[in-house]
Amino acid sequence: MIGKLSGKVDSQGDDYVIIDVNGVGYLVYASDKTLGTLAEGEFYKLFIETHVREEHMHLYGFLTLEEKIFFNLLQSVNGIGTRMALFILSSLTPSDIQIAVNNEDKNIFKAISGVGAKLAERIVLELKGKVAKISSGSAIIKESLNIKNITPVASNEVIKALVNLGFSRFEAQNAVQGIITQNPEISIDELIKTALKNRNSNF
């Protein structure tokens, strides 16, 4: 499964971009907001969600981990598929969705073309607990360290990734906190690499 692509934008369509990675062109579906950010010939890194359906494999690309997380989160709502999830992310940022759900603001979603009153209500009801859960794992780290470039959702994603790589949750949280304390401007990729390197050096 493809999790990330790094390459140059070859061309774009109405709902997709072709990323050239070492001469191989990958067709990646993306939100209007993401497509509007990409420039032909420029180099980008996209976080990829891979969907395999019978004989077809579709790739969905995102500039941030938060967008990828919320793309999957939106699809957990009854009645929302990949197209609608991308459509919502074309209108709202992950932060917008988070705030709207926490405030039970259905009108934010109803304002999006194609989202009716019933679907807007389901989004708020079905995501209420899930959004809170995503936020809680990293909110303390965010607040205590005054992190500028790593959001709560991204911090929590790093912690979950480290747990999947063999860390206990306590070890992962301490690793993230320690590394960001020393380098608040560190990127997510470097944060994970540093955590793994530090752990291996302790064995």
Curated annotation (Swiss-Prot):
One of its GO terms (molecular function) is four-way junction helicase activity. Residues 64-142 are annotated as: Domain II. Residues 143-149 are annotated as: Flexible linker. GO terms for biological process: DNA recombination; DNA repair. Residues 1-63 are annotated as: Domain I. The keyword Transport does not apply. The keyword Membrane does not apply. InterPro entries: DNA_helicase_Holl-junc_RuvA_I, NA-bd_OB-fold, RuvA, RuvA_2-like, RuvA_C, RuvA_C_sf. Has three domains with a flexible linker between the domains II and III and assumes an 'L' shape. Domain III is highly mobile and contacts RuvB. The RuvA-RuvB-RuvC complex processes Holliday junction (HJ) DNA during genetic recombination and DNA repair, while the RuvA-RuvB complex plays an important role in the rescue of blocked DNA replication forks via replication fork reversal (RFR). RuvA specifically binds to HJ cruciform DNA, conferring on it an open structure. The RuvB hexamer acts as an ATP-dependent pump, pulling dsDNA into and through the RuvAB complex. HJ branch migration allows RuvC to scan DNA until it finds its consensus sequence, where it cleaves and resolves the cruciform DNA. This is Holliday junction branch migration complex subunit RuvA. It comes from Rickettsia peacockii (strain Rustic).
